[in-house]
């Protein structure tokens, strides 16, 4: 790769990712209200929405689990730009559907389109963008570059959420569809291929008719099965070759498992307990996105050379856990806003893990390695709804098993709940104080 194309390629990549993420994120604050209005109008609680959301996450996760390594591996052979075209184009379809109408029937059409397009789109654009950056940046600068890429996505998140805060729901989906189209056109016109033409093994689009496209090794209908088996073997081989890669995969799985459960349940929890709506969701996301942007664009390039990726990974995981804990014990509507500020540090893990992974493989395996980590995150997204969707519905229902003060999803706290909770904690403190003489006498 010639150095003269490096900066230009990354600049166009950053613009492409900004436009794409803007189109994806602008609809996030309104989807809860749209889903509830289409399926359970006039209600703040809806089991159908929770289970449909979980089902969509499971289907998307299972599909992405198989697709991500395949997309990454194909991009190693046929180029990042070529593979980016498919998910970015498919992303337009569900957004255009909701821009047309948001009735119950259209919502189900959107649901089906979104579920099956997300199998290819969910995570693949970021996976290919990370591989693109790895093609153009030296190992020593990859963590900072990945952080900048994540910061660009966070900036898009903030800008999109600000727009959603002031736009109507209908206009929001129209803007999203327009930006999705614009991002695809910009990518095709301006983004240069990061892999030199002489290193690409084959072109996906060819003038000659291929008997078995992209699957030259195994003839006949056994090709698809054989390729899936081969991808699994390649994943296992990469894991065995590198202990750090295996460790990052495990950390990625468990952190994604927690994050997926939090994102799947927190919006319904906040809506049921504090009656959050589109505007409050947008405010919360703006705080989270702004903190993430500042962290990735300003703190990450400074902290990586001083602390290295491993320490930053530990710091990020600690603050991510603290954010989840603070949110789950929220006793007032302002607590989620304070928890969102933790994104200053909780956003570190993804960039750090991707950087560590990129250093464990050769340049011709970057797409495959990033695809493996993305597929492991997808596996966590499959497992998470199986546990969190029933639990969320159970604790949001009238038959919740218990109502532990401040540590419950129960939407109908008793009257004067804040006073009751304060008295509860005061009683705990007093009990501990009274126990001190007894503990000293018996055990010290």
Name each model feature, range by range.
Residues 18, 94, 105-124, 334-350:
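Hydrophobic core of transmembrane alpha-helices in multi-pass small-molecule transporters
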Residues 166-180, 390-416:
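A membrane-interface helix-boundary motif in multi-pass transporters
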Residues 141-165, 180, 376-387:
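Glycine-rich segments within core transmembrane alpha-helices of 12-TM secondary carriers
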Residues 66-80, 295-309, 392:
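Helix-to-loop junctions at the C-terminal end of transmembrane segments
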Residues 112-153:
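Cytoplasmic helix-loop-helix junction between adjacent transmembrane helices
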Residues 85, 89-105, 318-331:
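C-terminal ends and interior cores of transmembrane alpha-helices
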Residues 1-10, 193-251, 272-273:
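Juxtamembrane intracellular "pre-TM" segments in multi-pass secondary transporters
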Residues 30-50, 264-281:
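Short amphipathic helix-loop junctions that connect adjacent transmembrane helices
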